[in-house]
């Protein structure tokens, strides 16, 4: 699993939106727009991105790609700063699952939880939380896949 040190070793080019948007085999995601929530005026969005683990990778490439899935091209110049400000705080599987549950609480159709069966957990990182932004960004690594959970609100 990657950490802040792995990220810091990347060049600015390797952290760029153009590089991050590149190929990430098996990546798939589901997005819950504001109308999926009980209170659509809250303008919340959830995006859950997954990909099978690739041999020889530590998840960093997946995380960068997952962060730019819904990134707007006109904001490309802000991407490096955004990913560079991530906290890379190690969290437990219980904390990961609790944070997902808290952000998904107001979905009209309940989110199947936990996002991964409770086996094969390797580690998780809190990248952004409500402590600093109106964003929650989490990364989890399991023996068979990577998961990125993203929640934000514009209100």
Region roles according to the model:
Residues 1-99:
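N-terminal "domain-start" segment
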Residues 105-155:
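Acidic, proline/glycine-rich low-complexity IDRs
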């Amino acid at each position: 699993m990657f950490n802040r040190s792995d990220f810091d070793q990347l060049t600015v080019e390797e952290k760029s939106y153009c590089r991050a948007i590149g190929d990430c085999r098996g990546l798939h995601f589901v997005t819950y727009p504001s109308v999926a929530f009980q209170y659509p005026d809250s303008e919340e969005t959830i995006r859950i991105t997954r990909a099978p683990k690739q041999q020889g990778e530590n998840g960093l490439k997946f995380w960068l790609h997952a962060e730019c899935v819904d990134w707007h091209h006109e904001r490309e110049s802000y991407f490096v700063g955004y990913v560079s400000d991530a906290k890379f705080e190690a969290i437990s599987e219980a904390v990961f699952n609790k944070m997902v549950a808290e952000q998904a609480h107001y979905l009209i159709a309940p989110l199947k939880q936990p996002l991964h069966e409770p086996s094969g957990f390797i580690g998780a990182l809190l990248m952004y939380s409500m402590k600093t932004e109106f964003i929650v960004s989490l990364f989890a690594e399991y023996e068979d896949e990577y998961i990125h959970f993203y929640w934000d609100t514009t209100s």
